Amino acid sequence: MHEVWKMEKIKELTEDQLKEITKEGRTVLEFSADWCPDCKFLAPFMPEIEKDFSDAKFYEIDRDGSIDIAKKLIIMGIPSFVVYQDGKEIGRLVNKDRKTKDEVENFLRSLD
C-alpha cells in the first residue's frame, strides 16, 4: 500500500487557526486560488514536493477566502509560500511570478 500525499485545504483561515497549525514543527502554507492559472500549473507537482519534504506539514490556503490573513501576511501574488518553524515565520516565497517545482524545492531546501 502506498501513501497518498495530499495537503489539507483551508478555505477560510482565521488568526486562531494560523496560530494553531503553525505552533509546532515546520509548516508550509501555500496561498492559492481556484481561478489562478499559475497555481494550476504548480498543482501537479505539489504531492511530490510534499513527499520530498515530509518533515513539514503542508496546507493549501484559499487566498480569496482568507483575504484578511493574506493581507496581514502581505501575500501580493499567488501561488505564494510562507513557512513557519515552531510558530515563527522562517521564510517566504511571495511574488506574482509563476513558480516551478525546482524553484519551490530550492526555496524549501534553503531554509534548512
Q: Can you describe what each PLM-predicted range is?
A:
Residues 11-12, 31, 46-50, 54-68:
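Thiol-based oxidoreductase modules, predominantly thioredoxin-like and allied folds used
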Residues 25, 32-35, 77:
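Short pre-active-site segment immediately N-terminal to redox-active cysteine/selenocysteine motifs
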Residues 31-44:
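Conserved redox-active cysteine motifs that mediate thiol-disulfide chemistry
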Residues 85-112:
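Non-catalytic, surface beta->alpha helical segment in thiol-disulfide oxidoreductase systems
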